[in-house]
């Protein structure tokens, strides 16, 4: 029996990408023995009310953030499509591209696990991939309720404990807007890029 190779997928707005995203991706890569992790910035993300920075700038920040890690790469597949990005559509396209030799692992945060029932075609998503939900200490209860709900329907979600690093893209944007430093919350090259472009200052 051929052992399938495992590929990690991390989708999101990345507005901006920060150290928390990278730590989750690295924890997942190590825990699930992933060959690589592909970051997939969205063009427009469903259920997001905040207006994001231009897709090309968010894409560039992700490229800068992952370039030093040989296991990490970036795909512009959702940005090239333009329009709304649905995880189920992205997974179908990647399943077709990689074929049966690869197993897809979709990596998400605690909030994404909690909101999964509201996603477009959540059961199809769980059929197409292994869904990994990163959970910080103290944030596991709501995620476990969702996991139990899907398990009753024969769909499994893997919970991945990660260090309690309280960083969010929203907090970073607010700090910049208020003139506070975000150094060490984002990779150094991303920090420099944000400053040079004067992003999130208004």
Language-model features: locations:
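Nucleotidyltransferase catalytic core that binds NTPs
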Residues: 1-202
